[in-house]
């Protein structure tokens, strides 16, 4: 069997525990790489995170904005091969590549979409498995064929060449699952995400990038910095990203925006579209959405296309209070 066809749907209800060890092929994600003598200085002037202080064993969130502070991409940045990799949703990468390259002609830097394969290791035994393929410690490790990166306590990214990816997949002793479980864990961890449909809509703080340490307020200038700084010091940001959960009366659309409405008195008003979503087998779904940050947490929500549903804001796994 072709290694790329070994991944199957794992049907889970909202009450089922996650298996201890899973591997997935992250075809919906990819990486942009930067190599060259000026890679560090160039990227430092483009993104919200501090590239200069990023150590070999560290990974950081970051955002890339336009001049008005609107986000093109939210990514995980780490050292990869002889440069940097920016891991992010595949659908955002075409526009992000174009914008990131805009001023690169003046620098000794090569910016490209990586041809490496992205695999995701998930479950309570993920750390133990990584230790079997790595001789080092830390959140970023050089492994055969590429790099292993800790995404969260029970998740690792493997960014490796195709030959090594095939070896890992064929030798895998856990479950081979399709990538929606990675999306589910992103949602439950409230990982900031920008896909193609949400590019250039929000400032970083509306996506909680500051809450996951993806913004340095002490580094030098970068594109969009003025807006990002005003949002922090003048309190101009009025939005935040939330986890929402609710019931379904029909499957969610994979092609059209999934819009929520919120109750305003006796009426309903559009609240915006989900950034991403995951459906359980028991007609329950979860998602991420940007909402006004002064909303009451018991506000009533519903799917615009399914008005008989009821959705609610869920607790975030981190604090927004230090914004």
UniProtKB/Swiss-Prot annotation:
Q: Name one GO biological process term.
A: tRNA processing
Q: Which amino acid positions bind folate, per UniProt?
A: 29, 182
Record has 4Fe-4S as a keyword = no
Q: Main localisation, per the record?
A: cytoplasm
Q: Which Pfam families match?
A: YgfZ_barrel
Q: Where in the cell is it found?
A: Cytoplasm
* Keyword tRNA processing tagged: yes
What SUPFAM superfamilies has UniProt attached to this entry? Aminomethyltransferase beta-barrel domain (SSF101790), Folate-binding domain (SSF103025)
GO CC annotation terms, alphabetical: cytoplasm
Q: What keywords sit in the KW lines? A: Cytoplasm, Folate-binding, tRNA processing
**Gene Ontology MF terms in the entry:** folic acid binding
**InterPro entries according to UniProt:** GcvT/YgfZ_C, tRNA-modifying_YgfZ, YgfZ/GcvT, YgfZ/GcvT_CS, YgfZ_barrel
Record-annotated membrane-spanning stretches: none
| Gene3D superfamilies associated with the record | 2.40.30.160, 3.30.70.1630, Aminomethyltransferase beta-barrel domains (3.30.70.1400)
Q: Which family, according to UniProt?
A: Belongs to the tRNA-modifying YgfZ family.
UniProt function note: Folate-binding protein involved in regulating the level of ATP-DnaA and in the modification of some tRNAs. It is probably a key factor in regulatory networks that act via tRNA modification, such as initiation of chromosomal replication.
What protein name applies here?
tRNA-modifying protein YgfZ
- Naturally occurring in which organism (per UniProt): Vibrio cholerae serotype O1 (strain ATCC 39315 / El Tor Inaba N16961)
């Amino acid at each position: 069997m072709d290694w790329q066809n070994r991944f199957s749907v794992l049907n889970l209800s909202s009450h089922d525990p996650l298996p201890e060890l899973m591997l997935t092929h992250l075809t919906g994600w990819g990486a942009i790489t930067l190599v060259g003598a000026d890679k560090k200085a160039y990227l430092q002037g483009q993104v919200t995170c501090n590239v200069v202080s990023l150590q070999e064993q560290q990974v950081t969130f970051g955002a890339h904005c336009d001049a008005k502070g609107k986000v093109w991409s939210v990514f995980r940045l780490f050292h990869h091969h002889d440069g940097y990799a920016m891991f992010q949703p595949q659908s955002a990468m075409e526009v992000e590549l174009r914008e990131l390259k805009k001023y690169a002609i003046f620098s000794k830097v090569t910016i490209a979409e990586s041809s490496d394969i992205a695999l995701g290791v998930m479950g309570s035994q993920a750390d133990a498995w990584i230790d079997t393929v790595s001789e080092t410690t830390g959140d970023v490790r050089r492994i055969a064929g590429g790099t292993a990166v800790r995404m969260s306590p029970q998740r690792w990214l493997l960014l490796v060449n195709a030959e090594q990816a095939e070896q890992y997949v064929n030798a895998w002793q856990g479950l081979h699952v399709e990538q929606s479980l990675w999306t589910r864990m992103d949602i439950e961890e409230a990982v900031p995400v920008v896909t193609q449909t949400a590019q250039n809509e929000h400032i970083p703080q509306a996506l909680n990038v500051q809450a996951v340490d993806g913004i340095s307020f002490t580094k030098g200038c970068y594109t969009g910095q003025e807006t990002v700084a005003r949002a922090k010091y003048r309190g101009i940001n009025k939005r935040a990203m939330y986890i929402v959960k609710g019931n379904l009366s029909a499957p969610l659309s994979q092609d059209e925006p999934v819009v929520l409405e919120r109750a305003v008195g006796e009426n309903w008003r559009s609240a915006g579209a989900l950034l991403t979503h995951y459906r359980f087998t028991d007609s329950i779904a979860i998602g991420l959405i940007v909402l006004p940050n002064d909303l009451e947490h018991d506000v009533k929500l519903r799917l615009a296309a399914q008005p008989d549903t009821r959705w609610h804001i869920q607790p975030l796994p981190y604090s927004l209070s230090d914004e």
